[in-house]
């Protein structure tokens, strides 16, 4: 288990400074930070390689990338141009040697502002729109398979992800383990048991306090406080042989990246 940070700056020097301040040398880099994305709406493999080389010269390793978040329209088949650009970006990542991408495929469907018991998302398996969602996954997974890119799907719903895996089978169709799954009523400590370590391509570290059932009633707090036992989460990954990156995020008021990194490193070292 290695600790890294998210990076979204277009300035390699700034990213290197952020890494030094945090005490890490690995990042998951936003595709939007790569030169050319803003102009074209997608990245090329050459631009990914070049930016990665620039970061490497500054002692920073790009361990993975963060894919653009698709709109609801793109997922449901209503924006082919956006979907095509997303696929170009995924292909470029793999061609450039990126091993994994943090991917938020269904964020456009999450009820961020409303609470519907038993319905964390606007479209659930078997409902209208679900067939389109599966077609979307087939499309992006086929691209990932072509270039051997691991899709670390950021999906909190355990059973929903299993349904997607059953419909779109691929060793590259995996998951980001994020304790935010607690917001969906899932157990944030049992991801290894529920998904299998071979499917976990990337990890977040975050903690929350639940004040009520809706999304807005979960409070973000530093890693060493809250309802989630982060030590247990890290221990389960280490014991299962996870050989990847964990990135702290959503640290709440008073939380800092450098403190979170130090805390995670201490846990990894058995402290």
PLM region spans:
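N-terminal basic, low-complexity leaders that serve as flexible interaction/assembly modules and, when applicable
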Residues: 1-38, 42-44
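Histidine-acidic metal/acid-base catalytic patches
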Residues: 2-4, 9-20, 53-58, 73-76, ...
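Extended, basic/helix-rich recognition subdomains
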Residues: 150-159, 163
């Amino acid at each position: 288990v290695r600790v890294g940070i998210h990076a979204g700056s277009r300035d390699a020097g700034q990213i290197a400074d952020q890494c030094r301040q945090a005490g890490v040398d690995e990042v998951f880099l936003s595709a939007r930070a790569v030169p050319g994305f803003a102009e074209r709406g997608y990245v090329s493999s050459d631009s990914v390689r070049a930016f990665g080389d620039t970061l490497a010269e500054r002692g920073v390793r790009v361990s993975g990338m963060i894919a653009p978040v698709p709109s609801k329209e793109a997922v449901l088949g209503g924006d082919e141009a956006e979907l095509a650009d997303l696929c170009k970006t995924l292909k470029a990542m793999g061609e450039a040697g990126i091993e994994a991408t943090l991917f938020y495929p269904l964020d456009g469907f999450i009820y961020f502002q409303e609470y519907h018991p038993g319905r964390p998302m606007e479209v659930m398996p078997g409902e209208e729109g679900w067939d389109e969602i599966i077609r979307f996954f087939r499309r992006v997974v086929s691209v990932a398979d072509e270039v051997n890119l691991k899709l670390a799907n950021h999906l909190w719903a355990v059973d929903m992800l299993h349904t997607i895996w059953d419909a779109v089978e691929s060793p590259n169709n995996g998951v980001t383990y994020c304790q935010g799954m607690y917001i969906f009523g899932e157990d944030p400590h049992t991801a290894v048991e529920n998904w299998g370590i071979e499917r976990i391509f990337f990890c977040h570290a975050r903690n929350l306090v639940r004040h009520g059932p809706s999304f807005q009633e979960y409070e973000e707090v530093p890693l060493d406080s809250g309802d989630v036992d982060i030590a247990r989460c890290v221990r389960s990954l280490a014991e299962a042989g996870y050989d990847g990156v964990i990135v702290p995020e959503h640290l709440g008021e008073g939380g800092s990246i450098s403190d979170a990194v130090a805390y995670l490193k201490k846990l990894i070292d058995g402290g």
